[in-house]
Swiss-Prot record:
Organism name: Psychrobacter cryohalolentis (strain ATCC BAA-1226 / DSM 17306 / VKM B-2378 / K5)
Family per record: Belongs to the AIR synthase family.
Pathway given in the UniProt record: Purine metabolism; IMP biosynthesis via de novo pathway; 5-amino-1-(5-phospho-D-ribosyl)imidazole from N(2)-formyl-N(1)-(5-phospho-D-ribosyl)glycinamide: step 2/2
Listed name of the protein: Phosphoribosylformylglycinamidine cyclo-ligase
Alphabetized InterPro entries for the sequence: PurM-like_C_dom, PurM-like_C_sf, PurM-like_N, PurM-like_N_sf, PurM_cligase
Gene name linked to the record: purM
Source organism superkingdom: Bacteria
């Protein structure tokens, strides 16, 4: 027998027992999100899920995303309870764009040293996001990787699968001149532009960990960490009321803002004419713009600026759509209209 010390995985920085403890902590979180289509529970090599009944020719829709450097702010403020909601929102809102119903969700959590309490808090937030989306949390991966990350740092990725009837896929091809753009209010900066947010905080000299500054009736910490709004239930209400055929296009306003996200779903011959007087920047976006001396065009191309989601409908359906969305708990308004494109795909007026 060698005189060398016997090494274990824990000596290398990987605590299997901590990983097992986390799985036990989050089993109830996953169970609370279950849908009838889910087969089995956590812990298998693969998660099983049936396609919901009622579909004639179902298409599966997939998406993956993260929450960017909002994680750095979460670590700085030691606030991990809502970042999981952000993760789910970024994925499920993307799926909504083609008219899909979110079905199941998986997460990836990577860290330098696994803190079971922090990880459980994050996953609890993921579970909350899944409940808000009627989406089952059916699996995930926790990776403890010493040397890849600083001990307390962690990164997140989410993966979501949804389902949509093939004949009801929303592609944007039916968008026509005169169609109305309807905005759904965001809850804040959502999960995009946080590298610029953090730069603004740096140049402003504000200590966000202790500042008593108020924005939009809440602390600056709450304003910056407000979870991304999930639009699943509102869009479902709209589909049930108007029918998918009346929804000519939808866009999730993420990185790139209105400027870059609207063109992704619009015909090349048309432009979105945005009425900038139809809403006002919240105190959060005004604060960011003033503290960072950010140009208006840069604001529109970096942040959602208060518009988290956009729906394009025929003019004669706009009033009913806005009413339905407001009744579903959203703040909706007419953002603009579709016009012939002359140059830019998005025109601010």
């Amino acid at each position: 027998m060698s005189n060398k010390p016997s090494l274990s995985y824990k000596d290398a920085g990987v605590d299997i027992d901590a990983g097992d403890a986390l799985v036990q902590r989050i089993k109830s979180v996953a169970k609370a999100t279950s849908r009838p289509e889910v087969v089995g529970g956590l812990g298998g090599f693969g998660a099983l899920c049936r396609i919901p009944t009622g579909y004639t020719s179902p298409l599966l829709v997939s998406g993956t995303d993260g929450v960017g450097t909002k994680l750095k702010l979460a670590l700085q403020l030691n606030r991990h309870d809502t970042i999981g909601i952000d993760l789910v929102a970024m994925c499920v809102n993307d799926l909504l764009v083609c008219g899909a119903e979110p079905l199941f969700f998986l997460d990836y959590y990577a860290t330098g040293k696994l803190d079971v309490d922090v990880a459980a808090t994050v996953v609890t937030g993921i579970g909350e996001g899944c409940k808000l989306s009627n989406c089952a949390l059916i699996g995930g991966e926790t990776a403890e990787m010493p040397g890849m990350y600083q001990d307390d740092d962690y990164d997140l990725a989410g993966f979501c699968v949804g389902v949509v009837e093939e004949a009801e896929v929303i592609t944007g091809e039916n968008v026509a001149e005169g169609d109305v753009l309807i905005a759904l209010a965001s809850s804040g900066a959502h999960s995009n532009g946080y590298s610029l947010v953090r730069k603004v905080i740096e140049v402003s000299g504000v200590d966000v960990t202790s500042s008593n500054e108020q924005l939009d009736g809440q602390s600056i910490q709450d304003a910056l960490m407000a979870p991304t709004r999930i639009y699943v239930k509102a869009i479902k209400a709209l589909q049930d009321t108007l029918g998918s055929s009346a929804l000519h296009a939808m866009s999730h306003i993420t990185g790139g803002g209105l400027t870059d996200n609207l063109p992704r779903v619009l015909p090349e011959t048309l432009a979105a004419s945005i009425d900038t007087n139809s809403w006002q920047f919240s105190e959060l976006f005004t604060w960011l713009q003033n503290q960072g001396n950010i140009e208006q065009s840069e604001m529109y191309r970096t942040f959602n600026c208060g518009v988290g989601f956009v729906i394009v409908v025929p003019k004669d359906k706009a009033e009913a759509a806005i009413q339905t969305l407001n009744d579903a708990g959203e703040k909706a308004w007419k953002l603009g209209e579709m016009v012939k494109r002359e140059a830019d795909a998005v025109v601010y007026r």
